[in-house]
Amino acid sequence: MNLYVLNPAGCYDFHIAGNYLKDRRPNETVYYMHSSSVPVPEFNNSGRMVVRCYGENDITTALGAGAWVASAAELCRLVASIDGDHIVPDVISPQAVKLMTQEMPDHQFSLGWNFTPRNRPWIRTGSLVGTSALVLRYPDGECWVFITNTSTWKGHKFSQDTMALFEKLRKRFGSKMPKRNMFIN
């Protein structure tokens, strides 16, 4: 992944997360649980009780299913490198972009995205204990990312609320945003 996709895209600070606070990478946040959260059994059946965001799941084996750690800026750069827009050169073929972004029937995910409707934002959501994320790539090329370092108990409502916030912010401030390639090397 690093050799063929991330590094050619200019993304050098993506890493597979560790399972415990001691495994935290430089530049990685600390994850938090809600005050009502209770300790849970460690993923490896050790009998130890752990904080859910540090030891409930074996993150290192999740790989593409949520183990990656990256900043919002790095995620935007990756999206710009796989979106089929030639402002930032793509690191995947036009055929791969087309495959990943073809609109799917209701309740079916696109390849790598949750949804890729025509003339609306492409959507990718994700959550694990201790984090939630939302990535929107708009038809005008803007990419908006929101990442938390705590779990939300709102379920899918978290993404809906965040998308509504993004729309309000785009309407209010969109004309004030710079209209330029933010990833010029």
State where each predicted segment sits.
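Short, surface-exposed loop or secondary-structure junction motifs
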Residues: 1-121
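Gly/Ser/Thr-rich beta-alpha loop segments that engage phosphate groups in nucleotides
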Residues: 66-68, 128, 132
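Extracellular/periplasmic catalytic domains that process cell-envelope and extracellular macromolecules
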Residues: 104-107, 127-129, 136-140
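Short Gly/Pro-enriched loop/turn and capping motifs at secondary-structure junctions
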Residues: 118-120, 128-130, 151-153
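Hydrophobic residues embedded in beta-strands of well-ordered beta-sheets
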Residues: 120-122, 142-143
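Short, well-ordered beta-strand elements
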Residues: 132-137, 142-154
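Short, gly/Ser/Thr-rich active-site loops of penicillin-recognizing serine hydrolases
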Residues: 153-185
